[in-house]
Amino acid sequence: MHIVVCIKQVPDSAQIRVHPVTNTIMRQGVPTIINPYDLFALEAALRLRDEHGGEVTVLTMGPPMAEDSLRKALTFGADRAVLLTDRFFAGSDTLATSYALAAAIEKIGEVFGKPEIVFTGKQTIDGDTAQVGPGIAKRQSLLQLTYVSKIAELDLAGGKIKVERRAEGGVQVLETKLPVLITMLEGTNDMRRGSMADALRAARAEIVTWSAKDAGIEDILKCGLRGSPTVVKRVFAPSPRAEKAKQIEIQPVAIDTADALLEQIFGTLPALETELVELHQTL
């Protein structure tokens, strides 16, 4: 069995800042982390590998510094890491990103074996679109299961998988055939911690590095800014809004009934009583 997990290096949202003039995210000096939802996807993949055998390949698209996140994924137990990096990818929106990643997954299948499962996090904390995973599935003609919280059962012999999917008002149990793309929510599994030996192994590991050409990307105009129909015009922090509030004083006496309390409130704010009466008449 071969599983591919797409991860992304993102700024630590707890320390992110917005430039006061340009209203853009200031990334300089901000530490980076693996997107948290991608860690849930990685843990799900590693547990399936531990139970059923096979290999887990982690894939990321980004600048050379994204190698740090790949090595961390190797520390957690991934078998292989692929870095997709090229200046042509700069400025990619979700459409261009899914195009490049889908091409890389196709290439991974040719070189290392076709994956039965592709995992992504449900979304990234810097973009929050939740579009890249489904975009990859569409381009790869894969069935997709989104917002999955638990892998309930994997039947490799039968070529099918059963999952629990979080839905409004409850949980759905879904079963589908392989191959499939799954986007993961936070689940019931705790993320493993790599040992010192794992970290040393990851530090020595070879990172497979591909350019757009290496990944077999045919149309470079579909990559980066040129292949991105959406552009972020502005990022800004909302201005604090002063809330208008009225302070009322309640007499420090025992209030036995709700009517007594309302009498004190409405006696202090007669206008409020009038508004409530009018609202009641309207209803």
List where the protein language model places each region:
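N-terminal glycine-rich FAD/FM-binding segment characteristic of electron-transfer flavoproteins
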Residues: 1-283
